[in-house]
């Protein structure tokens, strides 16, 4: 997310706030799936694996709907000293969210839980329980990217590959993204990566 300053600032804040202590420092990644939400959730877990020496357990991914059917305390105990990524966490029921919150506050010492999902489905769940907000206090909101954001992302991605995009390339990139962007189609980060890879 090189070049998208508002998102980079949120990521830096989350890196400071997230902790393996179960009762706080858990992460929420909200936004459209088209803009790298799942990849960012995975990258956050990879980052804490390298940063925190208490991280020694397993990493698991599960959908919100599937987690509703699990025994929450037992599931979290199995992942102690590890991480759980809940994909499409908006599919969680309020009962499951409360069970996760209670388990993180009382039953598990060290774990990182990452909720990722659409803002429209996650916010109502989080607003329903004050304790959940204090347990999941590291938050990233990925807003829809403008063409300028996508161009900045492309330039950052190119830099990671040790390439640069000159002024003519930047103009061509704006034109390409503008042509692809329609009322029915939102250009995704993956499409921007493909443009750079094909250049």
Q: Where does each model-flagged region fall?
A:
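Conserved nucleotide-binding/hydrolysis micro-motifs of P-loop NTPases
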Residues: 34-35, 66-68, 90-92, 118-123, ...
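Conserved AAA+ ATPase small/helical "lid" subdomain
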Residues: 144-146, 150-199
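AAA+/P-loop NTPase substrate/partner-engagement loops
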Residues: 47-79
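Pre-Walker A (pre-P-loop) alpha-helix and adjacent loop at the N terminus of AAA/AAA+ ATPase modules
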Residues: 1-26
């Amino acid at each position: 997310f090189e070049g998208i300053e508002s998102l980079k600032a949120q990521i830096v804040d989350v890196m400071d706030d997230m902790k393996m202590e179960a009762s706080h420092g858990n992460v929420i990644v909200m936004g459209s799936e088209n803009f790298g939400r799942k990849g960012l959730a995975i990258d956050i877990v990879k980052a804490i694996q390298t940063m925190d020496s208490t991280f020694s357990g397993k990493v698991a991914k599960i959908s919100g709907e599937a987690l509703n059917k699990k025994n929450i305390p037992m599931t979290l105990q199995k992942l102690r000293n590890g991480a759980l990524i809940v994909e499409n966490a908006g599919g969680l029921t309020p009962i499951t969210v409360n069970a996760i919150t209670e388990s993180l506050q009382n039953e598990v010492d060290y774990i990182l839980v990452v909720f990722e999902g659409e803002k429209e489905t996650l916010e109502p769940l989080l607003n329903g329980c004050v304790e959940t907000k204090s347990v999941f206090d590291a938050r990233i909101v990925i807003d829809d990217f403008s063409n300028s954001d996508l161009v900045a992302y492309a330039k950052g991605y190119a830099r990671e590959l040790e390439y640069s995009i000159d002024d003519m390339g930047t103009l061509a990139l704006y034109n390409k993204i503008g042509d692809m962007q329609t009322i029915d189609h939102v250009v995704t980060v993956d499409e921007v990566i493909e443009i750079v890879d094909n250049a």
